[in-house]
Amino acid sequence: MSERIMKMDRNDKSILIRALHARYRTLKASGQPCEEVGRLILRIDATDPGRLRLGEDEYLLARNALNDLRNQRIASGGYTDAADAALANLLRAKVPFHLFGHAR
């Protein structure tokens, strides 16, 4: 399983939780399973700003949630600066490099 490390500041954390919460509400309203989104929200909330490790599924979930939030704000004529910055930081997330295949 591949994981990525995102550099996350306080603003990115806030907007990411807001985007995932919107995704959580839509999934819950439609009756679809939303436990994975809920666990990710709680994990991000418990993480201090700095580096956030995301698995491949979590990365895709966060990317899609931020993109949906950005699209909603564009449709309503709102500002997308915070969502754009968080999405850019998420897309720049790196796959960790382990020298000789060893994890630290």
Model-based region annotation:
Residues 1-104:
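Positively charged, low-complexity terminal tracts
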